[in-house]
Amino acid sequence: MNERGQGEQRVWEGGKGAPLLYLHGFEQHPGGAGFLRLLAENHAVRAPEFPGYGESGGFERLRDVTDVVLTYRRLIEDWGVGPVDLIGHCLGGMFAAEIAALCPHLVRRLVLVNAYGLWLDAHPMPDPFVMTPDALAKAKFHDPGWAAREPNVFAGSPADAAIVRTGNLAIATKFMWPVADRGLARRLPFIHAPTLVLHGVSDGLVPLPHAAAFARLIPDARVQTIAGAGHLPMVETEEKFVSAVERFLTPG
């Protein structure tokens, strides 16, 4: 397992098997987090860092969501493995859904994890960019005690985690501010791939009804909730998360 450059975009990769692409959330790349290593036991996993995040360049070329989709389309096509299984978390979930809608030939199965991308008047999302660290931890985690361990999971250098995160958030505002709604709801019906909508029950950033809204708009989708988890079920409930993903990707 290693990290390697993909042009200007850093990519974590590991494992062998069916190709699996993982798109991370708005705060930071997960590095070699435990859930990625577990997925790499049965899949050839690639987890690119979003352009402009951490050590990856290329953000200046992204004018809108369409440019993001084209960036990932190029990465998948350069991989040369045919359609991939695609997992997107948080903001990465929004981008994964866009890819599946606009490039359906590239996606075999789709997993959306606590995904952004919709706006529900009855269930508004808080603005994570103005929340205090304590408020953000309470919103993100079922057990806020996980917040103290998060940099060790998500950042290669915990001492630099706050600086890296600040820069990442500045980039995320392009797609999430004032709200993370760029018209995705109109495109979700064009997704052909079987879709699993995974959602941590205690998520205080993306309320649980958003999961049902995704499933209503995607033709072949179902919802699975994960108790004891908030916005990061792959961290708080790693084994439950990986088990749910594996059952969906390899049914039978």
Give the residues covered by each predicted segment.
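Conserved alpha/beta-hydrolase catalytic His-Asp/Glu region
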Residues: 121-127, 134-192
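Active-site loop/oxyanion-hole signature of alpha/beta-hydrolase fold enzymes
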Residues: 46-87, 243
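Flexible "cap/lid" loop of the alpha/beta hydrolase fold
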Residues: 97-102, 108-139
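Acidic catalytic loop of the alpha/beta-hydrolase fold
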Residues: 202-206
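Catalytic active-site module of serine/aspartate enzymes centered on a nucleophile-bearing elbow/loop
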Residues: 221-252
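Gly/Ala-rich beta-loop-alpha elbow adjacent to hydrolase catalytic centers
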Residues: 88, 92, 96
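Short beta-strand/loop motif that positions the catalytic acidic residue
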Residues: 191, 197-199
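Conserved HGGG/HGGXW glycine-rich cap/lid loop of the alpha/beta-hydrolase fold
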Residues: 7-55
